[in-house]
Regions:
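Short loop->beta-strand "edge-of-pocket" segments that line small-molecule binding or catalytic clefts
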Residues: 150-164, 177
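Conserved C-terminal helix/tail region of periplasmic/extracytoplasmic solute-binding proteins
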Residues: 316-389
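Short beta-strand->loop
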Residues: 94-105, 123, 238-250, 259-262
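Ligand-binding pocket segment of bilobal, Venus flytrap-like solute-binding proteins
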Residues: 161-165, 169, 173, 181-245
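Ligand-binding "clamshell"
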Residues: 88-95, 112, 117-121, 232-244, ...
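Mature extracytoplasmic/periplasmic domains
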Residues: 259-320
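A structural signal for short loop-to-beta-strand junctions that line the ligand-binding cleft
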Residues: 72-76, 94-133, 159-161
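Early extracytoplasmic/lumenal segment of secretory-pathway proteins
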Residues: 18-86, 213
Length: 389
């Protein structure tokens, strides 16, 4: 009887898994029905009957850690180019059955067979974009905003934000030093870390998704971030502007993948296929502001978006960009260690200074109180002497 119950439970669980998928995506990276936009997930659920459990991450590194440590089974993930390459090299992705993704035909040739997945076995492009400097024109001049050095400018101390992930943060320092974003040279990585350390005194915070509120409300005046997100932020704060810094900037592609251990591969492929449909891609990317890898989708999109020099920069501008590639294990570890050092040493210094100042204040207070008590005692003795006389 127990075996029969267990068999029924296992069958029920298996059938349930076939009717749902878990999607792991960047925060604020899908059209969700807000402002009369398409609710992509609801539309997919209505068309297929497959329920979507939707979870978000704020960096490639945090997503990678989640996959490595396990605990949750994901069916679709959307990492960036260099992270796709890393996941492939570590045998963490399932090959995609493209017979279940016929809408792949709409992906432009330019975005197929990229270096991170040269045979296009494991990924389908979702979006592409760039990183630039978002700044508040009320406080920061256009001239200052043409260089990444703006983020080190003491004039704006306390109002500057920085990426809270090593790859993006190091890329900015590497731009300023004239290094490739894909350098594995230990000394160059150390030099980049040293430059990042000099930035810390002028920063308000290291952030990722928190950047939206901080820039939209004017709590911070400048930050490096993704062009697509800028197009969302500027709707909330028209004082914001975007620049492609003269030293260079990152060009990236994000792609849909299926991780090993997924529970519903066919459901995952159905979801990927749905997102590749031109009208869905158009509605989705029209809302999130990122650039589409499908020319066919542009026919459905707002011309204001497709003609935007931020979303679709001129080729002459893109010549200054560089894409991330997968770093070797040693270089990755070196970068992570240096990044930890940049963040924690500054924090320890701040803590040390705070404790030191508190100790000094306590000592000063002690002497002031002691002096006051002594004066009162002397005054009291003087009164007694006068009374005795």
């Amino acid at each position: 009887m127990k075996k029969r119950i267990l068999s029924v439970l296992l069958l029920t669980t298996a059938l349930a898994a076939q009717n749902e998928i878990t999607v792991y995506n960047w925060g604020q990276y899908i059209s969700d029905g807000t402002d009369d936009s398409m609710d992509v997930i609801k539309e997919f659920e209505a068309e297929t009957g497959i329920k979507v459990n939707y979870l978000t991450f704020d960096s490639n590194e945090s997503m990678y850690t989640k996959l490595k440590t396990g605990g949750t089974s994901y069916d679709v993930i959307i990492p960036s180019d260099y992270m796709v390459a890393k996941l492939i090299s570590e045998d963490m992705l399932e090959p995609i059955d493209f017979s279940n993704v016929p809408n792949f035909e709409y992906i432009d040739e330019t975005f197929r067979n990229q270096s991170y997945d040269p045979e296009n076995k494991y990924s389908v492009p979702y979006t592409w974009g760039t990183v630039g400097l978002i700044y508040n024109t009320k406080y920061i001049s256009e001239e200052d905003a043409q260089s990444w050095s703006c983020l080190w400018n003491s004039k704006y101390a306390g109002k500057l934000l920085m990426f809270d992930n090593p790859r993006d943060a190091f890329a900015i320092a590497e731009s300023m030093l004239g290094y490739s974003y894909n350098t594995e040279d230990a000394q160059e990585l150390k030099n980049a870390a040293d430059l990042l350390a000099t930035q810390k005194p002028v920063l308000q915070a290291y952030v990722m998704d928190q950047i939206f509120d901080k820039l939209e409300r004017g709590e911070a005046w400048a930050a490096p971030y993704y062009a697509g997100d800028y197009l969302t932020m500027v709707e909330e704060n028209p004082d914001l502007a975007f620049s492609f810094p003269e030293e260079g900037f990152n060009f990236f592609s994000d792609a849909m993948c299926i991780p090993k251990g997924c529970q519903n591969k066919e459901g995952a492929e159905a979801f990927i296929n749905f997102l590749c449909r031109p009208d869905v891609s158009a509605a989705n990317l029209d809302y999130i502001g990122y650039s589409t890898p499908e020319t066919a989708a542009k026919e459905y999109m707002d011309e204001e978006v497709t003609s935007s020099p931020v979303a679709y920069p001129d080729p002459s501008v893109l010549e200054r960009s560089e894409a991330f590639e997968e770093l070797g294990i040693e270089a990755t570890q070196t970068m992570n260690d240096l990044w930890l050092s940049v963040k924690t040493e500054g924090a320890n210094t701040t803590l040390y200074l705070t404790l030191t100042l508190a100790a000094i204040a306590a000592v000063v207070a002690f002497f002031l109180i002691s002096a006051a008590v002594t004066r009162r005692r002397k005054a009291k003795r003087c009164r007694k002497w006068r009374e005795a006389e």
